[in-house]
């Protein structure tokens, strides 16, 4: 991290002046930020402390931040954690959640942006890379290009992707799988370059990057910043936040901004930074990294009250010196000069040649299918997990019998109960395992304006339907015929249809919860609890409670009509074909007093006692059950609409 600064500063001075001269000669684009302030209201205490939780205090995140940057320049925003770097990027790009607490102006080419124009002007690369693990680099960029550009020829898309990969030195690893923590793929630096390449496909003139070097080794971090510097010098504006840059990067930045507690402590070229702090009485030692030295100098030490007050006063003195300096006056003059141009240049929007909603849905479906198709173990588990459960049931049950004394009724009812209760849970496991990565990438790409979140949800639903049909078909075929259920094709068809809908409903219900709850583990636990409650209400257990609990039963039994398991359990008589079964006679000389099981000699008696309306309402229950599918699909789409609002306010 350390090294002599003098030679570096000489190169920096030369490079910085060259960049400024070039930008001043013919500035095609510019960004001007004037007096940006941002506050949030936070609760004082935790939720369990009611008196403190109800109280709020106002926290200043940004305070009167101003700067100006022109095309051909790269600006690095420095500062410790909590200094306001990321919030500043969010404010520039229009991604702030609580917009009512935002004050100030953002100008592009002297024009103040409208609310809906921010997304179409700035390309934003977040700190974490959201990429699909099983795609190659070329596939990932190709699908992004298809979502970005209106329907073009394959030749055009390929040339576009190849050009971007060449620009970011990705061509030699184009066919390499991206990978994840579970299996090896590309390196961290290569992942970051893929994220940048995805943004370049939209031909942006302004690029914002949040901590692009985080988690990378020194060499890779240097390469990323060098690459961004080259991109900036190709007539782009590049603004990055950076936490601990090496001294070798000093010469690459055309402008450097230092943030502390939401205030701009300094903004200017590298040589101006050295001169400014030296004039303030804080010369950088020769063997020190100037970045580290000045960031530490402008940070507030909170280890003790005395140190906090002392360092805060020092920061305020430096801020005051900067606000009264020629450097700051020059920044404000550049902002006013840009606004006062008679013929303002147009706003440099990204490529807005977007395809139709249906075509985007088709591309998302193709990308999702291609990504999951390479996960061989995942495909096998999705197809066979229901069958594995079937093996477990068959092992204990083997064949259905007709002997009441050996549990004929319990076996039939229990088999059907297990067959229709387990598939919703396997559907939940599928959604919890597969959808969170798609949700993460849709959160990012929907912010970039590539598509809406509901389109990703719908693409996933269309994707998993064939897998659900095949998985349930394998399970149904095995368990129905191996258990010796009623040998009739129509009965098997009903059995398959009921199990299929229960499996799909389980996955759809999980999608609904994934829309509003971030943690997949909480979602899984929540769906399991809902299914458990559905078993209690839907199976008719409440209707058989003791008379002392009749009041509770009456209150909760109303909810059974909103629970899909209530309608599924109504098919137990039909699936078990009880009315066609004549149970084996009891032993001679036995009586119902000795053995109550002898009260049942025909299956119809079991139906009349436990499911009195099941047969007469068969068609109605079947239609209502399948009506849950479009209903839950619509609710899932609405839940991700809610998610869009929640994320927008974070």
What are the language-model segments listed below?
Residues 226, 234, 240-241, 246-250, ...:
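Alpha-helical transmembrane segments and their short interhelical loops
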Residues 83, 114-116, 128-139:
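Conserved catalytic motifs of ABC-family nucleotide-binding domains
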Residues 411-479, 531:
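Hydrophobic alpha-helical transmembrane segments of multi-pass membrane transport proteins
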Residues 92-96:
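Helix-to-loop junction immediately C-terminal to a conserved catalytic motif
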Residues 207-211, 216:
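Catalytic Walker B motif of ABC-type/P-loop ATPase nucleotide-binding domains
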Residues 1-66, 71-73, 80, 103-108, ...:
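Topological signature of polytopic alpha-helical transporters
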Residues 199-200:
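ABC ATPase C-loop
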């Amino acid at each position: 991290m350390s090294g002599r600064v003098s030679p570096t500063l000489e190169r920096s001075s030369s490079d910085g002046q060259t960049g400024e001269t070039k930008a001043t000669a013919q500035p095609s684009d510019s960004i001007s930020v004037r007096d940006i302030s941002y506050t949030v209201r936070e609760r004082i205490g935790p939720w369990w402390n009611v008196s403190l939780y109800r109280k709020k205090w106002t926290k200043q995140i940004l305070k009167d931040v101003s700067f100006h940057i022109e095309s051909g320049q790269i600006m690095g925003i420095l500062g410790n954690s909590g200094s306001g770097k990321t919030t500043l990027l969010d404010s520039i790009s229009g991604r702030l959640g609580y917009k009512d607490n935002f004050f100030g102006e953002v100008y592009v080419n002297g024009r103040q942006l409208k609310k809906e124009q921010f997304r179409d002007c700035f390309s934003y690369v977040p700190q974490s890379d959201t990429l699909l693990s099983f795609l190659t680099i070329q596939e990932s960029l190709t699908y992004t290009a298809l979502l970005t550009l209106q329907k073009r020829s394959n030749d055009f898309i390929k040339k576009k992707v190849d050009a971007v990969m060449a620009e970011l030195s990705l061509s030699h690893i184009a066919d390499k799988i991206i990978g994840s923590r579970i299996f090896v793929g590309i390196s961290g630096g290569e992942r970051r370059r893929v994220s940048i390449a995805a943004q370049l496909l939209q031909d942006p003139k302004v690029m914002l990057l949040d901590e692009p070097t985080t988690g990378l080794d020194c060499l890779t971090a240097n390469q990323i910043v060098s690459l961004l510097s080259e991109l900036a010098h190709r007539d782009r504006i590049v603004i990055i936040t950076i936490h601990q840059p090496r001294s070798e990067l000093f010469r690459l930045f055309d402008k450097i901004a230092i943030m502390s507690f939401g205030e701009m402590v300094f903004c200017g070229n590298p040589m101006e930074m050295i001169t400014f702090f030296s004039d303030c009485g804080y010369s950088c030692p020769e063997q020190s990294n100037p970045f580290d030295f000045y960031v530490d100098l402008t940070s507030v030490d909170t280890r003790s009250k005395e140190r906090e007050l002392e360092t805060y006063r020092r920061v305020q003195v430096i801020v005051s010196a900067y606000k009264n300096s020629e450097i700051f006056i020059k920044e404000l003059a550049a902002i006013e000069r840009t606004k006062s141009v008679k013929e303002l240049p147009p706003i440099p929007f990204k490529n807005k040649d977007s395809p139709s909603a249906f075509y985007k849905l088709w591309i998302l479906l193709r990308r999702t299918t291609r990504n999951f198709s390479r996960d061989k173990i995942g495909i096998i588990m999705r197809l066979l997990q229901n069958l594995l459960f079937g093996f477990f049931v068959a092992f204990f049950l083997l064949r259905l019998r007709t002997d009441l004394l050996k549990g004929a009724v319990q076996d039939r009812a229990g088999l059907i109960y297990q067959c229709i209760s387990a598939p919703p849970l396997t559907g939940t496991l599928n959604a919890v395992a597969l959808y969170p990565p798609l949700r993460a990438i849709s959160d990012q790409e929907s912010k970039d304006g590539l598509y809406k979140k509901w389109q990703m949800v719908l693409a996933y639903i269309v994707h998993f339907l064939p897998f659900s049909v095949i998985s349930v078909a394998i399970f149904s075929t095995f368990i129905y015929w191996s258990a010796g259920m009623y040998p009739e094709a129509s009965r098997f068809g009903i059995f398959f249809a009921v199990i299929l809908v229960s499996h799909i409903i389980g996955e759809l219900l999980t999608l609904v919860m994934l829309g509003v709850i971030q943690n997949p583990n909480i979602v899984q636990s929540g769906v399991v609890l809902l299914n458990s409650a559905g078993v209690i209400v839907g199976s008719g257990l409440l209707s058989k409670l003791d008379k002392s609990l009749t009041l509770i039963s009456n209150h909760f039994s109303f909810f059974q009509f909103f629970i899909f398991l209530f309608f599924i359990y109504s098919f137990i008589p039909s699936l078990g074909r009880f009315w066609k079964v004549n149970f084996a006679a009891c032993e001679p000389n036995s009586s119902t007093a000795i053995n109550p099981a002898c009260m049942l000699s025909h299956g119809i008696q079991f139906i009349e006692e436990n499911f009195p309306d099941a047969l007469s309402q068969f068609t109605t229950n079947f239609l209502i059950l399948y009506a849950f599918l479009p209903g839950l699909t619509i609710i899932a789409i609405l839940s991700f609409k809610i998610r869009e609002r929640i994320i927008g306010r974070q």
